[in-house]
């Protein structure tokens, strides 16, 4: 029956301590099966302890079932293994045991059984710091006058009755404990259910049941444990069994003497061969002693694999010897030339032999944890391996320091490169920004219509004060009359203060000097501008324009001179003549009068050249 959960274990415990069994007995095969379940750890030890405690508390009213439950507890304690014993010695279960001892006075058989279990636990684990609560409960019961059975005689090793073989705790490692191969995504790790070691797939591909550990289903085991169980099942001869057990022991804990000797010789030959490439030192042939020959003969008789390995190493030694002799003969035939000796390269990295020694030492130390101390101290091969590993500690520290310095240097260089790249990016951004600004200020905005661009500059001369001066028109250049009139009108509009000053200085004639309106006769009007007058007036306008332009270039503001009134009086005539060519509705005809004119009338011709009235000036400005 395969039990893997606490509920299944409860059912099995009820079956072993059934009420149908008389006289407080129990079903012994089922009880042993329960102990195998506890020893194999298929159920957690704490859960197992709670299952037994629950059965004890539930059967407190039935003396027979209570007795069978404690008998089952005694069997499980002595066959359940150390993890289960730790849970039994905890406060949770020991308080229940103390309560039963103090309560059961009528049932002597049950009381004696519980006292016996407690006393055996006290004698076995009273010096254990992890299980010291048993001693506290024992002292408490002694102080209350509880007497324990004195007829119990324990052997020299009181823990022997509780020493049951259990599956070993799993060991974690990053390499196989047999071939020392590193674990990776493809080379997965596997634990042996017997020894708890970690191995690769190649060395843990066997599956067998482990009845001595309470495991009756095939589980994964390593090659060493598989050979051990295979030898137990197929015990053909005592000699074969003894030899294979010796091989397993040597593989697990130390290197055999002959194998260590062969490895040492192979290393010496390889070192001498490497030295011969740089120097002409002869290789001393290895002379095997008689003891070694006898040992080799024994090994050849016992193990064919070891025999093949020895032959292979001897063959390699012979080949190295022949190769060195050939090199020596070729050097003697060639003329002697001074060959430059290569400079020795000091390498701080560990060699393959040192790495193998470290891995082998680590795996052996893990396996030696479960062995007694005297075997560890007496193992000379393990001590030699430890000395070799400790000798390589200085080189390992130096190599680690060298790698750390290189790492720090690379980190510093990476930081400098990132800082330089940031500075370079900042400079590029500044350069691009300056190029964009220069393009904005240097590139002119070309208008879509050049004629509009020209007319805008001509129609807005008031804005030319902030720009370079206009080119002065020569007398022979052609200029339309319409443009001249436009410029004059703009000038009149752009200088309102001048017109206001002109209005202030206008001399208004008295009503006595003006002729009455009744003498004016209305008649059809003639053309306002004859051809000759138009030409004369155009020439006069060009000259006035040139003079006004010259004055505006010299000084942008009007200059107050002595003849300021005369200049002001002349400007409205030009404005009236060209800007507003209006035709009067009727022509003024002056009737002949017999009244003689005064002498000053010839000096001021009012009829022909009359200055504009203030009303006309206001109309012009509007």
UniProtKB/Swiss-Prot annotation:
Query: Which residue range or ranges hold the UIM domain?
Result: 258-277, 301-320
| GO cellular component: a single term | protein-containing complex
Query: What does altering residue 193 to A do?
Result: Decreases the association to PtdIns(3)P containing membranes
Compartment list: Endosome membrane
**Bias (Acidic residues):** 533-548
From start to end residue, where is composition biased (Basic and acidic residues)? 317-328
* UniProt modified residues of type Phosphoserine: 157, 495, 613
Cross-referenced Pfam families, in alphabetical order? Answer: FYVE, UIM, VHS, Vps27_GAT-like
Question: Which residue numbers delimit the VHS domain?
Answer: 18-149
What kind of membrane protein is this, topologically?
Answer: Peripheral membrane protein
Q: Could you tell me the keywords of this UniProt record?
A: Endosome, Isopeptide bond, Membrane, Metal-binding, Phosphoprotein, Repeat, Ubl conjugation, Zinc, Zinc-finger
Polar residues biased stretches: 462-500
What highest taxon heads this organism's lineage? Eukaryota
Basic residues bias (residue ranges):
239-249
Q: Where is this cross-link: Glycyl lysine isopeptide (Lys-Gly) (interchain with G-Cter in ubiquitin)?
A: 294
Per UniProt, Zn(2+) 1 binds at 176, 179, 200, 203
Entry's Gene Ontology molecular function annotations: K48-linked polyubiquitin modification-dependent protein binding; K63-linked polyubiquitin modification-dependent protein binding; phosphatidylinositol-3-phosphate binding; protein domain specific binding; protein heterodimerization activity; ubiquitin binding; zinc ion binding
InterPro entries assigned to the protein according to its UniProt record, in alphabetical order:
ENTH_VHS, HGS/VPS27, UIM_dom, VHS_dom, Vps27_GAT-like, Znf_FYVE, Znf_FYVE-rel, Znf_FYVE_PHD
Q: Which PROSITE patterns match?
A: UIM, VHS, ZF_FYVE
Q: Where is this region: Disordered?
A: 236-260, 317-348, 462-622
Please name the GO terms of the biological process aspect recorded for this protein, alphabetically. ATP export; cellular response to nitrogen starvation; late endosome to vacuole transport; microautophagy; microlipophagy; multivesicular body sorting pathway; positive regulation of protein maturation; protein retention in Golgi apparatus
Role description: Component of the ESCRT-0 complex which is the sorting receptor for ubiquitinated cargo proteins at the multivesicular body (MVB) and recruits ESCRT-I to the MVB outer membrane. Controls exit from the prevacuolar compartment (PVC) in both the forward direction to the vacuole and the return to the Golgi. Allows VPS10 to return to the (trans-Golgi network) TGN from the PVC. Might also function as an alternate adapter in the COPIb clathrin-like coat.
Q: How does it assemble?
A: Component of the ESCRT-0 complex composed of HSE1 and VPS27. Interacts with ENT3 and ENT5, the ESCRT-I subunits VPS23 and VPS28 and with the COPIb subunits SEC27, SEC28 and SEC33. May form a complex composed of VPS27, HSE1 and DOA1. Interacts with DOA1. Interacts with ubiquitin.
Additional comment: Present with 172 molecules/cell in log phase SD medium.
Name of the protein = Vacuolar protein sorting-associated protein 27
Q: Which organism is it from?
A: Saccharomyces cerevisiae (strain ATCC 204508 / S288c) (Baker's yeast)
Organism taxonomic ancestry: Eukaryota, Fungi, Dikarya, Ascomycota, Saccharomycotina
């Amino acid at each position: 029956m395969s039990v893997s959960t606490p509920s299944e274990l409860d059912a099995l415990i009820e079956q072993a301590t059934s009420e149908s069994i008389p006289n407080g007995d129990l079903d012994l095969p089922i009880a042993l099966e329960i102990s195998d379940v506890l020893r194999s750890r298929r159920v957690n030890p704490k859960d197992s302890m709670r299952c037994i405690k629950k059965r004890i508390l539930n059967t407190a009213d039935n003396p027979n079932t209570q007795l069978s439950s404690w008998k089952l507890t005694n069997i499980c304690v002595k066959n359940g293994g150390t993890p289960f014993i730790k849970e039994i010695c905890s406060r949770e279960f020991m308080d229940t045991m103390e309560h039963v001892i103090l309560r059961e006075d009528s049932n002597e058989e049950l009381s004696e059984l519980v006292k016996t279990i407690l006393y055996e636990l006290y004698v076995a684990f009273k010096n254990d710091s992890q299980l010291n609560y048993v001693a506290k409960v024992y002292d408490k019961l002694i102080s209350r006058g509880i007497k324990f059975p004195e007829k119990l005689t324990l052997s020299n090793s009181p823990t022997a009755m509780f020493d049951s073989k259990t599956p070993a705790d799993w060991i974690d490692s990053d390499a196989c404990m047999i071939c020392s191969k590193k674990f990776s995504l493809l080379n997965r790790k596997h634990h042996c259910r017997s020894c708890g070691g970690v191995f690769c797939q190649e060395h843990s591909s066997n599956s067998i049941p482990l009845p001595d550990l309470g495991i009756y289903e095939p589980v994964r085991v390593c090659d060493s444990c598989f050979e051990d169980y295979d030898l137990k099942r197929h015990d053909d001869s005592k000699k074969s069994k003894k030899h294979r057990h010796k091989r397993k022991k040597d593989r697990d804990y130390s290197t055999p003497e002959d194998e260590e000797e062969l490895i040492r010789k192979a290393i010496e030959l390889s070192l001498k061969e490497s030295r011969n490439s740089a120097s002409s030192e002869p290789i001393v042939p290895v002379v095997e002693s008689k003891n070694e020959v006898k040992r080799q003969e024994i090994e050849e008789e016992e193990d064919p694999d070891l025999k093949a390995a020895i032959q292979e190493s001897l063959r390699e030694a012979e080949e190295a010897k022949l190769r060195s002799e050939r090199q020596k003969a070729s050097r003697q035939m060639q003329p002697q030339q001074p060959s430059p000796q290569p400079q020795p390269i000091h390498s701080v990295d560990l060699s393959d032999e040192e790495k193998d020694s470290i891995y082998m030492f680590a795996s052996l130390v893990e396996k030696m944890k479960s062995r007694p101390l005297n075997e560890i101290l007496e193992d000379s091969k393990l001590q030699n391996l430890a000395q070799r590993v400790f000798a390589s500690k200085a080189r390992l520290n130096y190599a680690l320091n060298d790698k750390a310095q290189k790492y720090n240097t690379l980190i510093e260089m990476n930081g400098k490169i990132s800082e330089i790249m940031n500075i370079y990016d900042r400079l590029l951004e500044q350069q691009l920004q300056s190029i964009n600004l220069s393009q904005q200020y240097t590139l002119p905005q070309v208008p879509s219509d050049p004629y509009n661009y020209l007319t805008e500059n001509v129609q807005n001369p008031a804005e030319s004060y902030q720009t370079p001066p206009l080119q002065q028109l020569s007398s022979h250049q052609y200029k339309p009359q319409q443009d001249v009139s436009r410029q004059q009108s703009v000038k009149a509009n752009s200088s309102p203060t001048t017109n206001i000053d002109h209005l202030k200085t206008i001399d208004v004639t008295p009503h006595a000097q003006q002729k009455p309106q009744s003498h004016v006769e209305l008649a059809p009007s003639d053309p306002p501008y004859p051809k000759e007058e138009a030409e004369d007036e155009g020439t006069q306008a060009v000259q006035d324009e040139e003079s006004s332009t010259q004055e505006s270039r010299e000084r942008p503001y009007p200059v107050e001179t002595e003849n300021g009134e005369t200049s002001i009086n002349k400007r409205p005539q030009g404005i009236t003549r060209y800007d507003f060519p209006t035709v009067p509705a009727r022509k003024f005809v002056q009737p002949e009068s017999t009244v003689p004119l005064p002498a000053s009338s010839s000096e001021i011709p009012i009829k022909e050249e009359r200055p504009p009235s203030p009303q006309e000036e206001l109309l012009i400005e509007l």
